[in-house]
Design a protein with these regions (language model features):
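N-terminal leader/targeting and pre-domain segments
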Residues: 42-307
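Membrane-embedded hydrophobic alpha-helical segments
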Residues: 1-40
Length: 307
């Protein structure tokens, strides 16, 4: 076989070699290129940013309103809609959505959705307004309530849990009904805690709660056992005309202000280890058979043990 390279192949090699040589010469003769980072984009004016955020917020609110309209026709979407509204509060605590919820949680509303659950854990809720609503479970564990929290005439047909929550202003539960008990253990009430005329069925706990201002349980009706063990009542406190169907437990409680149990009735009152402050000008009216012992210095002030 011949070892001579065919002419066409030699021509192809020459052409490629020439092209490469020309490219090298061209790159050598061009000035060096210096790469500089591009300048950061100009920030948007504050007014534009605020408008975009407002538009985005309004779009989300409109989507929730549309979902509520769909849920009116499809009951299977109703709990999802309620959950989405509560999720919106996580990123936008002041969202104007309480009116939307009330429209669907009030029994006298033509758009009432029965059997809805409210479930919020470790969040912030502002200006809560559930007046006259009826829900099944109400779980608000470790929630911070900013502004007044309105639960007047609210009916809870299932479990209720406010454990370790904090009310920064007034907590208003006038005439609320807890049909399966409630848990307010370790809850902090910074402003007025108003529970006049409430009714409970099932065990109810306020153990280790802190009431910093006026506390009102006047005419409350506790259908089963209730415990205020270790509670701190710093302001004026009233249980006037309250009704306890079982033993009312106030063991280790602290009463730092006025205390009024006039007309309160229980199967028995237990105040073991409870104390009342005696070095401030306050008035105390205890249930029959309950008296204060000799005052003793304790930080702060002087306290007497109830017995």
């Amino acid at each position: 076989m011949s070892t001579l390279t065919p002419f066409p192949l030699l021509a192809l090699i020459g052409a490629v070699s020439g092209a490469v040589t020309a490219w090298v010469l061209l790159r050598r003769d061009r000035p060096a290129q210096v790469l500089t980072p591009s300048a950061p984009p100009e920030p948007m004016p504050d007014g534009v940013t605020a408008r975009l955020l407002a538009d985005e917020r309004e779009a989300r609110l409109d989507a929730l309103r549309s979902l509520a309209e769909e849920a009116d026709e499809d009951p299977g979407l109703r709990q999802d809609c309620v959950d989405e509204v509560l999720a919106q509060f996580r990123t936008d605590p002041h969202a104007p959505l309480w009116e939307l919820l009330r429209e669907h949680l009030r029994r006298d509303s033509p758009r009432f959705w029965p059997g809805m659950d409210l479930h919020v854990v470790f969040g912030l809720l502002a200006d809560v307004d559930l007046r006259g609503c009826e829900v099944r479970d109400g779980v608000f564990r470790t929630v911070g309530f900013a502004g007044d929290a309105h639960f007047e005439d609210t009916v809870f047909t299932g479990k209720v849990n406010f454990e370790e929550s904090c009310f920064a202003r007034h907590a208003l539960f006038d005439r609320a009904r807890f049909e399966a008990g409630a848990n307010f253990e370790h809850t902090t009430f910074t402003g007025t805690a108003a529970f006049p005329g409430i009714t409970t069925h099932g065990r109810t706990w306020f153990d280790a709660a802190r009431f910093s201002a006026r506390t009102d349980f006047a005419a409350a009706g506790f259908g089963d056992g209730v415990s205020f063990g270790g509670v701190g009542f710093s302001g004026p406190t009233t249980f006037r005309d309250a009704r306890f169907a079982a033993v009312a437990l106030f063991g280790q409680a602290r009463f730092g202000g006025h205390a009024d149990f006039t007309g309160a009735v229980a199967a028995a009152f237990e105040f073991a280890g409870a104390r009342v402050r005696t070095d401030v000008h306050v008035v105390h009216t205890w249930p029959d058979g309950v008296t204060a012992g000799e005052p003793a210095p304790r930080h702060p002030g002087r306290w007497a043990e109830l017995r």
